[in-house]
Regions:
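Short S/T/G/P-rich N-terminal loop/turn motif that feeds into the first structured element of a domain
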Residues: 18-256
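Bacterial Sec-dependent N-terminal signal peptides
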Residues: 1-23
Length: 256
């Protein structure tokens, strides 16, 4: 009887784990720095490769150029919204094409990095939101071991507040799942202009109220201070990377 109960627990645990993994959404990134004297050749080769291999929703890839900080001039290529089955596909021919036709123009590159998007802590990144902004700000931190829940709480509540107040901007929280430090998180938001309300408007924010006031109204007295202090204390390494990227549509899949 004891063995039967143990077996049932193991089966149930595996089933729940599989369901959890199955519901996760993955974004895959690659970084490339072209040779200084071959940037135009690199871009031409990337464009040709994209037009040949990445022409529909299933094979789509999007390119962003880092425009500030130590990685300026690096190009990020992102594959978005995938489940685990993506990693079972055979990309050998596509990889071989890349090595032969694009690789010769590359001075440095990263390996594949797999990111998990935390949907409950993100807003404006649902599949139906297909608009790609001109710029994206990435702020990366390393979170202390065992402190993920404390870090995410404020971000999850901010996402709920954004929805309730019909925020016109967007915000997403990612964590590296493979190919890097699995305690590294990236908080990302997109925008089209640097001045004015380029990052978004809190449409339904009551007149005379601040976002902090609205947060406390929704989640309780001094919730803003409590939650953000807890989130800050959960961070082991601040400023791991803060950079801005610019979308390069001509080097990306064109979706109708």
């Amino acid at each position: 009887m004891k063995k039967t109960i143990t077996l049932l627990i193991l089966i149930l645990s595996y089933s729940l784990s599989a369901q959890t993994w199955g519901n996760r959404e993955y974004w895959i990134s690659y970084e490339y720095t072209p040779k200084a004297d071959q940037i135009s050749e690199f871009e031409k080769a990337v464009k040709e490769k994209t037009n040949k291999w990445n022409t529909n929703f299933e094979t789509a890839i999007f390119t962003f150029e880092v425009v500030n900080g130590p990685n300026s001039g690096t190009y990020e290529r992102w594959v978005t919204r995938k489940d685990r089955s993506f990693f079972d596909q055979d990309f050998s021919k596509e990889i071989e094409y890349w090595k032969k036709n694009v690789g010769k123009y590359i001075a440095d590159q990263s390996g594949q990095q797999t990111w998990r998007i935390f949907k409950g802590a993100s807003y404006g990144w649902d599949p139906e939101n297909t608009t790609i902004n001109k710029f994206y700000q990435q702020n990366r931190v390393v979170v202390k071991a065992g402190m993920t829940a404390q870090f995410l709480r404020a971000h999850e509540r901010m996402a709920k507040l954004m929805k309730a107040l019909n925020y016109t901007g967007n915000r997403a929280v990612f964590r590296i799942e493979n190919g890097g430090n699995t305690r590294e998180f990236a908080v990302v938001y997109g925008f089209d202009q640097h001045g004015g309300d380029g990052s978004g408007i809190w449409t339904n924010l009551p007149e005379g109220s601040s976002v902090r006031d609205a947060y406390n109204e929704m989640f309780g007295y001094e919730a803003w201070t409590t939650d953000w202090e807890a989130s800050s204390k959960a961070i082991e390494l601040w400023g791991n990377l803060a950079q801005k990227t610019r979308f390069r549509p001509e080097l990306s899949t064109k979706l109708q």
